[in-house]
Amino acid sequence: MNIRNARPEDLMNMQHCNLLCLPENYQMKYYFYHGLSWPQLSYIAEDENGKIVGYVLAKMEEDPDDVPHGHITSLAVKRSHRRLGLAQKLMDQASRAMIENFNAKYVSLHVRKSNRAALHLYSNTLNFQISEVEPKYYADGEDAYAMKRDLTQMADELRRHLELKEKGRHVVLGSIENKMEGKGNSLPSSGEACREEKGLVAEDSGGDSKDLSEVSETTESTDVKDSSEASDSAS
């Protein structure tokens, strides 16, 4: 399975996945609105044949009276690929992109009160908190929970990871300079320098600097149907 940033050519297949999985559906222009306005924030999950089996459609909220924050418009995973942790990985990727590109402080979403699988995922696995109940939010009259996830901890982890990478880069440069002084050789080739850097960064970072993407790969939601029913009706 591969998770990557959504591209314009993916939007029609994302819409098809949405129609298969969710009661909340959107016109194609709404997908293009997200893709063109916030191209960094939406992600797709694809199988070994490159077929889209899940997606997250996300955006930034434009509220000048609030801190920067993102919003999950829609999340879906096809039934054939649920219980693989894909929903969690898609959500984490989108949240990470919100931090890196827009300095988001939190992310919000809406979920049907009756969607127990999605509530379990959001509350127990992704640390969303219910902020309020919005009566008759959905077109069929069902209420929605408005939920928020604080992104401070994820932002701190990203910052530490970048600091470790920068520290490793300085260690590599120092090692190269020492070798040059000791041997009197010319500068190493770019390939040699890259190999030096990879080895030293791995030694320096140890277990504590594990890439966040690796963390999400090993962490799967438990007893969750991967929440492909979770979505926002997107006002």
UniProtKB/Swiss-Prot annotation:
GO molecular function ontology, one term from the record: protein N-terminal-serine acetyltransferase activity
EC number: 2.3.1.255
Post-translation changes: Cleaved by caspases during apoptosis.
Region described as Interaction with NAA15: 1-58
Catalytically driven reaction(s): N-terminal glycyl-[protein] + acetyl-CoA = N-terminal N(alpha)-acetylglycyl-[protein] + CoA + H(+); N-terminal L-alanyl-[protein] + acetyl-CoA = N-terminal N(alpha)-acetyl-L-alanyl-[protein] + CoA + H(+); N-terminal L-seryl-[protein] + acetyl-CoA = N-terminal N(alpha)-acetyl-L-seryl-[protein] + CoA + H(+); N-terminal L-valyl-[protein] + acetyl-CoA = N-terminal N(alpha)-acetyl-L-valyl-[protein] + CoA + H(+)
Keyword Lipid metabolism: no
GO CC aspect terms: cytoplasm; NatA complex; nucleus
InterPro entries (UniProt xref): Acyl_CoA_acyltransferase, Ard1-like, GNAT_dom
Residues with PTM N6-acetyllysine: 136
Residue numbers of Phosphoserine PTMs: 186, 205, 209, 213, 216
Domain of life: Eukaryota
UniProt cross-references to PROSITE patterns, sorted A to Z: GNAT (PS51186)
Disordered as annotated region, ranges: 175-235
GO biological process: N-terminal protein amino acid acetylation; negative regulation of maintenance of mitotic sister chromatid cohesion, centromeric
N-acetylmethionine: residues bearing it: 1
Biological role stated in the UniProt entry: Catalytic subunit of N-terminal acetyltransferase complexes which display alpha (N-terminal) acetyltransferase activity. Acetylates amino termini that are devoid of initiator methionine. The alpha (N-terminal) acetyltransferase activity may be important for vascular, hematopoietic and neuronal growth and development. Without NAA15, displays epsilon (internal) acetyltransferase activity towards HIF1A, thereby promoting its degradation. Represses MYLK kinase activity by acetylation, and thus represses tumor cell migration.
Family (UniProt): Belongs to the acetyltransferase family. ARD1 subfamily.
Protein name: N-alpha-acetyltransferase 10
Annotated organism of origin: Bos taurus (Bovine)
